[in-house]
């Protein structure tokens, strides 16, 4: 049985950080399609099929920053967990925040992992 290709949705408002993630994925030879949303609102639109330009077909994996305008990462994750069509989405937090409160909020929302951005592709 062939598995469907997994699309990676990067939810990141910072252009430099988004480019760094893209380079790290290439360095790790991860060739999955990478799509970017600027914030949580745009990500939800893409996931729910209401975005004007992009609709993602499952399966997908999310890499979500915590600090973003309009709808932050924790708010996005909580919205996804409340949506019966999205609740099983695999989500990793990818952020510069090493704060315990952010880690607790993320794990309370059942993320698969919490990665602190270091700028090093080796740690990614």
Residue ranges with predicted function:
Residues 112:
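Short, glycine/charged-rich "phosphate-handling" switch motifs in NTP-dependent
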Residues 12-13, 93-98, 118:
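Conserved active-site segment of CheY-like receiver
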Residues 5-26, 62-64:
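Conserved acidic segment of CheY-like receiver
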């Amino acid at each position: 049985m062939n598995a469907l290709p997994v699309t990676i949705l990067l939810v990141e408002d910072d252009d430099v950080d988004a480019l760094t993630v893209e380079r790290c994925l290439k360095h790790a030879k991860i060739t999955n399609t990478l799509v970017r949303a600027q914030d949580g609102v745009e990500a939800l639109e893409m996931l729910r099929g209401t975005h004007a330009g992009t609709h993602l077909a499952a399966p997908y994996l999310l890499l979500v920053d915590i600090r973003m305008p309009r709808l932050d990462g924790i708010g996005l994750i909580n919205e996804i967990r409340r949506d019966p069509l999205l609740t099983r989405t695999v989500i990793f937090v990818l952020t510069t925040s090493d704060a315990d409160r952010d880690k607790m909020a993320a794990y309370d929302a059942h993320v698969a992992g919490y990665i602190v951005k270091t700028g090093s592709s080796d740690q990614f």
